[in-house]
Structures are given as structure tokens and as C-alpha cells.
């Protein structure tokens, strides 16, 4: 199980990552990583970076049956 410090250090080394990538790298369940990332965000140590829908290749994200699953969410240190 990863610690909050390990998540912070991994973000420092890699720059920005998705929660799923952090989960795989640290071999920790994604709900736990999500909670740690939210904690880092509330402490002002990490920032959530969301892609804008205008980056959608087809331009149909609003009517996408997957509910904007194509939009990625990244995490980085402040």
C-alpha cells in the first residue's frame, strides 16, 4: 500500500499523471489513490488538470454515449 508521500514523490518525478497510472505504478487500489489525490489537492500540494471538450476529435462529446469518457484528468504538483 502506498503512502501520501509516495504519491507526492511520484508526481514530482513524472510531472503529471492520471490516477489510473499512479494506481498501477504504486500497486494500490484506485479508490485509495483518488482519496490521496483529493487530500493532496485540499492541502494545496496537487492540482487537477482536466482536458477541455474542444479537444475532442469528433466534436460530439456532449452527445457521446460514454458520457465524456474521452476527456482525461491529470494530476500534477503545484
UniProtKB/Swiss-Prot annotation:
<dbReference type="GO" id="GO:0003677">
    <property type="term" value="F:DNA binding"/>
</dbReference>
<keyword id="KW-0804">Transcription</keyword>
<dbReference type="GO" id="GO:0051536">
    <property type="term" value="F:iron-sulfur cluster binding"/>
</dbReference>
<protein>
    <recommendedName>
        <fullName>Probable [Fe-S]-dependent transcriptional repressor</fullName>
    </recommendedName>
</protein>
<keyword id="KW-0678">Repressor</keyword>
<dbReference type="Pfam" id="PF09012">
    <property type="entry name" value="FeoC"/>
</dbReference>
<keyword id="KW-0805">Transcription regulation</keyword>
<feature type="binding site">
    <location>
        <position position="64"/>
    </location>
    <ligand>
        <name>iron-sulfur cluster</name>
    </ligand>
</feature>
<feature type="binding site">
    <location>
        <position position="61"/>
    </location>
    <ligand>
        <name>iron-sulfur cluster</name>
    </ligand>
</feature>
<dbReference type="InterPro" id="IPR036388">
    <property type="entry name" value="WH-like_DNA-bd_sf"/>
</dbReference>
<dbReference type="InterPro" id="IPR036390">
    <property type="entry name" value="WH_DNA-bd_sf"/>
</dbReference>
<keyword id="KW-0238">DNA-binding</keyword>
<feature type="binding site">
    <location>
        <position position="70"/>
    </location>
    <ligand>
        <name>iron-sulfur cluster</name>
    </ligand>
</feature>
<comment type="similarity">
    <text>Belongs to the FeoC family.</text>
</comment>
<keyword id="KW-0408">Iron</keyword>
<dbReference type="GO" id="GO:0005506">
    <property type="term" value="F:iron ion binding"/>
</dbReference>
<keyword id="KW-0479">Metal-binding</keyword>
<dbReference type="InterPro" id="IPR023732">
    <property type="entry name" value="FeoC"/>
</dbReference>
<feature type="binding site">
    <location>
        <position position="56"/>
    </location>
    <ligand>
        <name>iron-sulfur cluster</name>
    </ligand>
</feature>
<dbReference type="InterPro" id="IPR015102">
    <property type="entry name" value="Tscrpt_reg_HTH_FeoC"/>
</dbReference>
<keyword id="KW-0411">Iron-sulfur</keyword>
<comment type="function">
    <text>May function as a transcriptional regulator that controls feoABC expression.</text>
</comment>
